[in-house]
């Protein structure tokens, strides 16, 4: 497995950082029944849809351009950040992130098409439009990198970290945390959930500490 930090930094790093990072390898979901945030969200919006989709399996989830783009952007950002924190900032800056996003979108599209019974769910023009928007997002993140993802006072502790907790006997909650950072100067942790959207955030959402803290 790739080293988390240089040997010279081992003494400075909270051992929990290593524990969190390796949890995605060590945790293996059991065969117990589990629920996810997606299923809870679906139930809150429409119990009938939840019944048809999760209980009766009568309405299978279908991939679309938004899930395709979201998956590709997640993977691109996570690869970029892992390179930045676990290798070098210079190496991350030299990555062709535009090409990486394109490759990830094609991979996500092919996977989604297979899940949809090999039916096309978008067009080449739409894929290209989303890719162009994604390039702007990546350029913005690189420009603001030091403000959002400082390598001086933050350590990347987790990517796609598995949450698998019993909430009732025999019922588990299963979820994945996009990014977990450790702040050695304060001993605090921060969790980042990557979201892609065409609508952006309203002012009240930006000020909601439960969404931005």
Name the predicted role of every residue range:
Residues 1-67:
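C-terminal, charged and often intrinsically disordered regions of DNA end-processing helicases
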Residues 2-13, 25, 96-99, 110, ...:
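Metal-dependent nuclease catalytic regions and adjoining charged, substrate-binding loops involved
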Residues 35, 68-72, 129, 174, ...:
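Generic recognition of stable, solvent-exposed alpha-helical segments in well-folded globular domains
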Residues 40-86, 131, 135-139, 160-161:
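Nuclease catalytic cores
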Residues 47-60, 116-117, 191, 197-201:
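Short amphipathic alpha-helical segments and their helix-coil junctions
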Residues 61-65, 69, 122, 126, ...:
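Conserved aromatic-histidine-acidic binding/catalytic patches
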Residues 76-159:
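A non-catalytic, helix-rich entry segment at domain boundaries
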Residues 154-213:
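Mg2+/Mn2+-dependent nuclease catalytic core
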